[in-house]
């Protein structure tokens, strides 16, 4: 199957670009994920910093894209340049399986579009649109792999909420006895994913960095992210420290983070009718995927998670996470449990449930989410 995909992708590129060389390998890959989600939410009481909310419970049920993993297709290529050096590229496009629409702001390759060089001894350099270091290093520590709707670790740790930047130069070292580091700089984040996203002429910049250790059953990661906006505006920043240990029968995950002066990517809790006052400093917090700054905002974040295999085809996982803000905002607690069942090596069923109390940092906001779905990788 992999050989067929590689040959097919190579034939496509050869037809587009001319001669294909034997030392070049191109792989076509992807996955499709779609499910059904039920949500029941209660919009909380009035908050002086966020505007007026109602107090009724509301619910809905419908088809949802990418509960476990965002649907995508991509091309991954490498060319051997000799002496351990290779040219590499990744072009990855996100889409919604329920309607066929493009994701990531209707970009053609919104998930990733990079070209770079990789050396066996000196590491890898990538240029283009890609995720930050935190989203790379904590995907294996979070029991929910930074996915599954509100169950993602990114709900409480916004710098790990699959943050993507345009115009990024990123260097990652090779693994030295299990240790690896990385640093990236975006010359213009150019975010267009939300209605208040960054415009190109804003020239907002960002830095992302981290180190991790992966050895046997132990994983440890530390990351730091900061965004640089106009000099008169706050500069959001967050560090995250996390670890996971696999006891074979159970994998335990722990993380702590601290955010200052804003949110990198807010989780969309979709409070079904609760409208944030657009004139308040906290606009967009929790209800959209927008980034925002708020001078003096501080949020301490915590995660405790577990995962365990059941037989040879099933896994169960759970987590508790808390985001504890200042500014008189409400603590947010999220309790989650998930389950996967492998039908084959490439196809699986899944189920997930989560309960958020104090969602979007507002007293009385409650959100229950239950989803089931099917994922196929190719």
Regions found by a protein language model. Name each.
Residues 85-87, 121-125, 178-181, 217-222, ...:
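Repeated loop/turn-to-beta-strand initiation elements of outer-membrane beta-barrel proteins
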Residues 69-73, 111-115, 165-169, 205-209, ...:
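Hydrophobic, lipid-facing positions within transmembrane beta-strands of outer-membrane proteins
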Residues 32-36, 91-93, 129, 183-185, ...:
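Transmembrane beta-barrel strands of outer-membrane/channel proteins
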Residues 23-38, 48, 58-188, 212-219:
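Outer membrane beta-barrel
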Residues 1-22:
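Gram-negative bacterial Sec-dependent N-terminal signal peptides
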Residues 341-343, 366-378:
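Outer-membrane beta-barrel "beta-signal"
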Residues 77-79, 117-119, 173-174, 213-215, ...:
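Residue-level signature of outer-membrane beta-barrel architecture
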Residues 202-336:
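Detector for outer-membrane/organellar transmembrane beta-barrel domains
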């Amino acid at each position: 199957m992999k050989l067929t995909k590689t040959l097919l992708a190579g034939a496509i590129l050869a037809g587009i670009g001319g001669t294909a060389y034997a030392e070049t390998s191109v792989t076509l890959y992807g996955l499709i994920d779609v499910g059904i989600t039920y949500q029941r939410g209660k919009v909380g009481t009035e908050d002086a910093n966020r505007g007026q909310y109602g107090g009724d419970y509301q619910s809905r049920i419908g088809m949802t894209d990418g509960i476990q993993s965002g649907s995508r297709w991509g091309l991954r290529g490498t060319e051997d340049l000799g002496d351990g050096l290779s040219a590499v590229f990744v072009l990855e496009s996100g889409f919604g399986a329920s309607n066929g629409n493009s994701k990531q702001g209707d970009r053609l390759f919104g998930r990733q579009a990079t070209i770079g060089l990789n050396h066996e001894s000196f590491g890898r350099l990538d240029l283009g649109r890609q995720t930050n270091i935190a989203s790379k290093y904590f995907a294996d520590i979070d029991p929910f792999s930074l996915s599954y709707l509100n169950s993602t670790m990114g709900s409480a740790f916004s710098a790990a909420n699959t943050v993507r930047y345009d115009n990024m130069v990123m260097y990652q070292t090779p693994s030295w006895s299990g240790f690896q580091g990385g640093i990236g700089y975006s010359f213009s984040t150019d975010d267009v994913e939300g209605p208040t996203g960054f415009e190109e002429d804003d020239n907002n910049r960002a830095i992302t960095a981290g180190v991790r250790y992966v050895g046997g059953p132990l994983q440890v990661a530390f990351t730091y992210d900061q965004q640089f906006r106009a000099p008169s505006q706050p500069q959001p920043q967050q560090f995250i420290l996390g670890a996971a240990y696999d006891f074979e029968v159970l994998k335990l995950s722990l993380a702590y983070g601290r955010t200052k002066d804003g949110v990198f990517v807010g989780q969309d809790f979709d409070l079904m009718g609760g409208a944030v006052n657009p004139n308040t400093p906290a606009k967009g917090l929790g209800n959209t995927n927008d980034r925002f700054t708020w001078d003096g905002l501080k949020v301490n974040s915590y995660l405790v998670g577990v995962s365990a295999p059941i037989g040879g085809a099933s896994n169960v996982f759970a987590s508790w996470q808390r985001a504890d803000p200042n500014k008189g905002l409400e603590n947010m607690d999220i309790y989650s449990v998930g389950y996967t069942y492998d039908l084959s090596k490439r196809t699986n069923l899944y189920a997930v449930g989560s309960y958020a109390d104090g969602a979007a940092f507002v007293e009385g906001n409650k959100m229950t989410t239950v989803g089931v779905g099917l994922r196929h990788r190719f």
